[in-house]
Amino acid sequence: MTIALDKFTKDENDLFDIMDDWLRRDRFVFVGWSGLLLFPCAYFAVGGWFTGTTFVTSWYTHGLASSYLEGCNFLTAAVSTPANSLAHSLLLLWGPEAQGDFTRWCQLGGLWTFVALHGAFGLIGFMLRQFELARSVQLRPYNAIAFSGPIAVFVSVFLIYPLGQSGWFFAPSFGVAAIFRFILFFQGFHNWTLNPFHMMGVAGVLGAALLCAIHGATVENTLFEDGDGANTFRAFNPTQAEETYSMVTANRFWSQIFGVAFSNKRWLHFFMLFVPVTGLWMSALGVVGLALNLRAYDFVSQEIRAAEDPEFETFYTKNILLNEGIRAWMAAQDQPHENLIFPEEVLPRGNAL
């Protein structure tokens, strides 16, 4: 029997190998296969946002001014969501709504879907970039796994929540003041602050901030080798290559402070990874629940007693009244197409909430 050697060896000029060699070449800014998704999507998302906040009005979708051209500033400009009547249309430039007319596409809110979808894929591309580089330098992929937290929050808030509602209209617009208004909307219509998933998200994010502050301060406090400057600040060198802090000293310090302390760096740093990522994932799950109009905690017994007894009031019942005021004010303003009319006696009156 004859054996053909090298029969299945790859052609040296194979197109995939040529592209792989160029994409993953060592350069100042790594490109990689993930870059084919990341860079175009990030460019279009950021470019679309700058274009919208600079030039595009929200008059036709929200009845608002939202661009620098109309007199907004950085905090009040936004790329606004499409009108509620457009439901969940992708609003493609060549679609039946805009029919290839760029000006009409902008007026209809096409830039919002453009920025949201390119932004989502850009974030996914950035996570894939971390996977790819970790693989290249033989690291574990925990950076990429951690970045799944922000991606989950973005996708749940900007895509899944409006998909569960009547249209993109109910997603946040891309702007600072617009996001603040969306937060108030979430509170008034979903009582978001009393949602256990929001509580877990707050605990995760603020807990992570506390852990970062404690960890950074502890490492700086336990440096045992510094430069030879005359005082502490001159001797401290932030670019020192060697690890010269004492885990043993840090453990002793926190054992005396709290009675317990991390005994090894692996568990400490895993905990610092686990707390914020879990918090972000929990808040994302909560927003998915809101997309389905799942309710937060309801203490109905307190509401009934407060309605029957004028002298009984709790912070919960006061917040429920506040939420009713938010709904009464925001619904008529945000959804004029619904022709909502509230009797004067149910509208909030100054401090009389």
From Swiss-Prot:
This is Photosystem II D2 protein. The gene is psbD. It is a multi-pass membrane protein. It comes from Atropa belladonna (Belladonna). The keyword Nucleotide-binding does not apply. One of its GO terms (biological process) is photosynthetic electron transport in photosystem II. One of its GO terms (cellular component) is photosystem II. The modification Phosphothreonine is found at T2. It holds the Pfam family Photo_RC.
